[in-house]
Amino acid sequence: MKNKQKVVVVGGGFAGLELIRKLGNSKIYDVVLVDVNNYNFFPPLIYQVSTGFMEPSAISYPFRRILRDKKSVRFRLGSLEKVVPSENKIILSNGELHYDILVMATGAESNFFGNKNIEKYSLPMKTISDALSLRNTILTRLDRATRLQKAEDRKRLLTFVIAGAGPTGVELSGILAEMSSSILKKDYPELDREDLGGIYLIDGQKAVLSAMSTKSQKYTHKKLEQYGVKIKLDTFVKDFDNEKVLLSDDTEIFTKNLIWAAGVSAKTFEGFHKESYGKGNRLKTNEYNLVEGYTNIYALGDCALVLGDEAFPNGHPQLAQPAIQQAENLAKNLERKDDNWKNFAYKDKGSLAIIGRNKAVLDIPGQNYSVKGFLAWLIWIFVHIMGLVNFKNRMRAFVDWIGYYIHRDQYFRMIIKPKEREV
């Protein structure tokens, strides 16, 4: 026990959680997990929290509960502020920690591309806090619209612009379209169909789901338009002043709702060499996830730019699977002798996106084959239920989905605004 090395893992997302699971009962390492939240959550489903289809507890779970049977792991609540490699320590918002090995698994944050107005006024969707804020905003504005006299004022409150037509943007636009067609008329009889200003999906690429196959793109585009979603491609959001969205083609959309799903960048921290950062502020690593310029600092997941994988010379996609696989490989390497480490090589297991009820798309890698419709939807549900952290979360998610599927209704449309209090 006295000779154990201390591994500090910063970030408890897909990569960080997988690493501590693998090293949780290690005989050669003591592990400390650091996170700004005291819970892990499942990012692919936060859009369902933001629209009231799921409760936050269905996709989140306390770290300390997860770590109960991990004898070699301890949890530290705190926010990373600075790295001091020369002293093998990190500075947190509430103290400091020393390490023998540091693993950065800090994920990514919304990228506003330097636009201060968009950063200030738009509605991001990266965290559970973001999702609850978006849910409160949507429901508050729906309620406010019932009291407005002018049709143009109601329409501005009930027009939604979603920037980014990746899986998050597609899934959110689809679920908002389902809300407008099946729920609003039942719960808001004061509003007419004409009061709903529309749902716009904006993207600078030439197709929705640009990372997926052409078949999946065309199917998704067609189904979203059938839902009534207005899609504008090869166009990006230029500015937003909380009253109207200005697009790159100089089109203006009058709305108070710009939902930002248009890209991410890794977080940066004081203490790293500038040369260690690459594209998207990701830490450049070798094929073992070792950060360039350091001998005992590693990076995993969204914050890592792995330059040693020949199949992905520009780095891996910032998705769950690369993060999990990197963590698995690093955990095995840390348990091996130094001369027996294995390179990381990403194995693509496919891509999924849900569009709406009974509609989803699946691309199978290496087969040039796509699945769409009801079967893809069932696969999407299975994959996402199994991706949740434990059985209790899986059951909650399953019950929530079954309830909506049978009743075509959302159970979690409550406006809950926590009171700020100094702790």
Range-by-range predicted roles:
Residues 1-4, 73-163, 259:
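FAD-binding core/adjacent interface of flavoenzyme oxidoreductases
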Residues 1-76, 160, 167-211, 259:
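Beta1-alpha1 glycine-rich phosphate/pyrophosphate-binding loop at the start
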Residues 8-10, 97-107, 237, 245, ...:
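Short hydrophobic core segments
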Residues 15, 107-110, 173, 264-266:
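Short glycine-rich anion-binding loops that position phosphate/pyrophosphate groups of nucleotides
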Residues 71-82, 177-287, 293:
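A Rossmann-like FAD-binding core segment of flavoenzymes
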Residues 120-150, 243-244, 252-325:
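FAD-site-proximal beta/loop scaffold in flavoenzymes
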Residues 322, 326-423:
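C-terminal, flexible cofactor-proximal segment of oxidoreductases
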